[in-house]
UniProtKB/Swiss-Prot annotation:
It comes from the Eukaryota. GO terms for molecular function: protein phosphatase 1 binding; protein serine/threonine phosphatase inhibitor activity. It comes from Caenorhabditis elegans. This is Uncharacterized protein ZK945.8. InterPro entries: PPI_Ypi1. Coiled coil: none annotated. Residues 63-109 are annotated as: Disordered.
């Protein structure tokens, strides 16, 4: 059994024109930038910050999943998950230590 023979006819450019592809580095390297709503806590006399630094990955223009914030992010403290609500034992009270923490569940609040 023989394989079928395929014949292709190609036209060549007789003028001898050459195309040159030159690769160039991006104009700017990726870097950290601050949004307009970021507050500088270092020089405001505050003792602590409620949130840590937040990295926002670049968005892909044709991928809607990169447009919206993650589900685990909250309005005031992005990047941290909300703690699960613990039910207090019936007839008793939960510890005051847990009630003093902020809503985001991170160790900064």
């Amino acid at each position: 059994m023989q394989a079928p023979v395929v014949t292709e006819t190609c036209q060549t450019n007789e003028e001898g024109e050459q195309l040159v592809l030159r690769l160039r580095a991006p104009v700017e390297r990726p870097r950290v930038t601050w949004g307009a709503g970021v507050i500088d806590n270092e020089h405001m006399g505050r003792l602590k910050s409620n949130c840590c630094c937040i990295y926002t990955p670049p968005r892909v223009w044709d991928d809607p999943s990169t447009w919206e914030p993650e589900e685990h992010e909250t309005e005031h403290c992005r990047g941290h998950t909300l703690p699960e609500k613990k039910q207090k034992p019936q007839g008793g009270h939960g510890s005051d230590k847990d009630e003093d923490k902020g809503n985001c569940g991170c160790d900064h609040c």
